[in-house]
């Protein structure tokens, strides 16, 4: 990872609140904080149709890792998709490491935007600028090509795995 603006957060959490805020994300956040991993989690409950806030670009920019939890309704949110475009732009520049988590969705469904994601993009296409929708699709495709983890029956094991991986990488970066 190339050097960039001073790191304020070790981790930026990107997730669809409706799907994961009160279960998986709350457990993951608690474990990261317990391990003294500085973590940014947007605690705002968003209204349907609310747009991505430019203020969120800053926490992304000053984070080492982005843990992106794509769940069934992630792509239904223009906010989440705008956030993902920003994250993937920083990833492309080498200024953030993206850790994909496929929560209750198959990576291939995300990569090819099939199944429920196809329906979500059909809705976006009817009300959004085609260029914006194309950016969202490309960001999701690029994201799904990264090596990541899939949720299973045991969220606690996945939480431990993610926290261990970040702790180990954080230690490596500290020695560079």
Curated annotation (Swiss-Prot):
Keywords: Cytoplasm, NAD, Plant defense, Receptor. GO terms for biological process: defense response; signal transduction. Its main location: cytoplasm. Residues 7-170 form the TIR domain. Coiled coil: none annotated. It is found in: Cytoplasm. GO terms for molecular function: NAD+ nucleosidase activity, cyclic ADP-ribose generating. SMART domains: TIR. InterPro entries: TIR_dom, Toll_tir_struct_dom_sf. The keyword Acetylation does not apply. The keyword Cytoplasm applies. Mostly present in shoots. GO terms for cellular component: cytoplasm; mitochondrion; nucleus; plasmodesma. Disease resistance protein. Resistance proteins guard the plant against pathogens that contain an appropriate avirulence protein via a direct or indirect interaction with this avirulence protein. That triggers a defense system including the hypersensitive response, which restricts the pathogen growth. Interacts with MED37E. This is Toll/interleukin-1 receptor-like protein. It comes from Arabidopsis thaliana (Mouse-ear cress).
């Amino acid at each position: 990872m190339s050097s960039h603006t001073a790191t304020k957060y070790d981790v930026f959490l990107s997730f669809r609140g409706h799907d994961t805020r009160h279960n998986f994300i709350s457990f993951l956040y608690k474990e990261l904080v317990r391990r003294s991993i500085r973590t940014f989690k947007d605690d705002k409950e968003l209204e349907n149709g609310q747009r991505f806030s430019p203020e969120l670009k800053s926490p992304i920019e000053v984070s080492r890792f982005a843990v992106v939890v794509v769940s069934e309704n992630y792509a239904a949110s223009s906010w989440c998709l705008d956030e993902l475009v920003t994250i993937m732009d920083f990833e492309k520049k080498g200024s953030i490491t993206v850790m994909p988590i496929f929560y209750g969705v198959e990576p291939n469904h995300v990569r090819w935007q099939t199944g429920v994601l196809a329906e979500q993009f059909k809705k976006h296409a009817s009300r959004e600028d085609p260029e914006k929708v194309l950016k969202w699709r490309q960001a999701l495709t690029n994201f799904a090509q990264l090596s990541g983890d899939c949720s299973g029956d045991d969220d606690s094991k996945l939480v431990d795995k993610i926290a261990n991986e970040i702790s180990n990488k954080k230690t490596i970066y500290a020695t560079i």
